[in-house]
């Protein structure tokens, strides 16, 4: 298959280094993320996202839901693996035609200790 017809899985958006604010064992599995960060990174609600704990190396695949300002909440089974105060990166990926992927720049959102966006840019 030539470069033009191939599909590549590429980073679409990332939020880092976010701080986990709460865990909720009784809620449906997933991640609640500050709505402003969802929009800034180009995520969509119910999208599959990857979450990486930058200190332990734990990696999870989660459903994304919109949360309150400053919120990074792990729900359900994920709450057993990562604790409040942990620093995490949250990323989404998507398929693109190889040719388009060569020019693609993902949305990268850096946040402060209160999970407020301090810088948004395109990677590259």
Name each region found by the language model.
Residues 106-124:
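Short, glycine/charged-enriched hinge/interface segments at domain edges or termini
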Residues 2, 8-10, 19-21, 25-102, ...:
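Compact, glycine-rich, soluble single-domain proteins
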């Amino acid at each position: 298959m030539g470069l033009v017809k191939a599909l590549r899985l590429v980073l679409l958006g990332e939020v880092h280094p976010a701080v986990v604010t709460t865990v909720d064992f009784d809620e449906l599995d997933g991640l609640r993320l500050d709505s402003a960060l969802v929009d800034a990174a180009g995520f969509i609600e119910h999208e599959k996202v990857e979450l990486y704990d930058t200190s332990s190396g734990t990696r999870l695949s989660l459903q994304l839901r919109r949360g309150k300002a400053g919120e990074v909440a792990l729900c359900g089974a994920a709450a057993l693996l990562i604790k409040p105060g942990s620093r995490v990166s949250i990323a989404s990926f998507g398929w693109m035609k190889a040719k388009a992927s060569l020019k693609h720049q993902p949305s990268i959102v850096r946040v402060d200790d209160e999970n407020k966006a301090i810088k948004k840019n395109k990677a590259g």
